[in-house]
Design a protein with these regions (language model features):
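Short, glycine/charge-rich flexible loops or terminal/linker lids adjacent to PRPP-binding catalytic cores
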Residues: 37-76, 83-92
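Short glycine-rich phosphate-binding loop at a beta-alpha junction
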Residues: 24-35, 111
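Short Gly/Pro-enriched loop/turn and capping motifs at secondary-structure junctions
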Residues: 59, 81-84, 114-119
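PRPP-dependent phosphoribosyltransferase catalytic core
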Residues: 92-138
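Short loop or secondary-structure boundary microenvironments that flank
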Residues: 33, 81, 136-138
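Short histidine-centered catalytic/ligand-binding loop motif
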Residues: 3, 76-79
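Active-site-facing substrate-recognition patch
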Residues: 1-23, 72
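Conserved acidic residues
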Residues: 27, 73-75, 107-109
Length: 138
């Protein structure tokens, strides 16, 4: 994760190159927590797209919004890693609940992780623990 802080321009170029190489059509990055809040505005501006940050439940805020930012039509989940899938599930649920509430539609088009190297995970190929059950999966 240090790449965000040491070389954010390098991270941006790696994300751009990876998504271009994979022919991913996207218009939004969505992440969660402080690291997303720090990098997504810069990343999205550089790649000419929208961004949104989903608040973690434990984060106190003056805002009643679970999501800050804008979600377009084709969004990419952006996080340092996917281990159990808890954050991935939570972000997906928040995005779709928010869109449903606003009577909008958007498609999830994959995930980008950046902890060791920038990696694109196409839909259904995310390294999510199959044993992990999120509260809305039942």
């Amino acid at each position: 994760m240090k790449e965000i802080f040491v070389d954010p321009d390098g991270l941006i170029e790696n994300v751009r190159s990876t998504l271009s190489h994979e022919n991913v059509e996207y218009d939004t990055f969505v992440g969660s927590g402080l690291s997303a809040a720090l990098i997504l505005p810069r990343l999205a501006t550089a790649l000419d797209c929208a961004w949104a940050v989903v608040r973690k439940k434990s984060e106190g805020s003056h805002s009643c919004n679970e999501i800050e930012g804008t979600i377009g039509e084709r969004w990419v989940f952006f996080d340092d890693l996917i281990e159990t899938g808890e954050t991935w599930h939570r972000v997906q649920k928040a995005v779709y609940d928010n869109l449903r509430h606003q009577r909008l539609r958007a498609s999830y088009v994959g995930a980008v992780t950046y902890s060791w190297e920038v990696t694109y995970w196409s839909v259904g190929r995310e390294p999510v623990d199959p044993e992990f059950k999120f509260e809305y999966d039942e």
